[in-house]
Amino acid sequence: MGDKWIGVALSDPLRILASPLVILRRDDDAKTVENIEALVKTHQPDLLVIGLPVSLNGTIGPQAEKVKAFSGLLSQSLNTEIIFRDERFSTDEARRKMNDSGKNNKTVRDDAAAAAVILQDYLDETNPPCFQP
């Protein structure tokens, strides 16, 4: 979650695959909360996974504090669980995936793709793979 843009991703109903959904312009907090409320109403997720910009040394810096403060506003208006995930390197991974798929150029925003990386990491960690013989 940045100061200007918020990438949004959504998982499939089985919580196996995360996909980029939309990029929200972050104007003021009230409008941004309203936009996220609309997405939650439309898609009815079980929870929100929010990327937390942890510093490379693992500490919570000023940007992470901003994210936590904004998430507090969200939790006041939504009846949805919020989980934080370390978002370090998510943009780099998203750019690599976009480049590998031929979709990477300077005019394409990668915020939603980075959100999908963060969500996919969460899904992979919480849903162990299963195999049908």
From Swiss-Prot:
One annotated GO molecular function: nuclease activity
Q: What's the EC number here?
A: 3.1.-.-
Q: Which GO terms describe its cellular component?
A: cytosol
Enzyme category, top tier:
hydrolase
Alphabetically sorted, this entry's keywords are: Cytoplasm, Hydrolase, Nuclease, Ribosome biogenesis
Which SUPFAM superfamilies does its entry note? Ribonuclease H-like
Q: Which GO terms describe its biological process?
A: rRNA 5'-end processing
Cross-referenced InterPro entries: RNaseH-like_sf, YqgF, YqgF/RNaseH-like_dom, YqgF/RNaseH-like_dom_sf
Where on the tree of life does the source sit, at the highest rank? Bacteria
Q: Where in the cell is it found?
A: Cytoplasm
Return the similarity comment.
Belongs to the YqgF nuclease family.
**Role, per record:** Could be a nuclease involved in processing of the 5'-end of pre-16S rRNA.
Give the protein's recorded name. Putative pre-16S rRNA nuclease
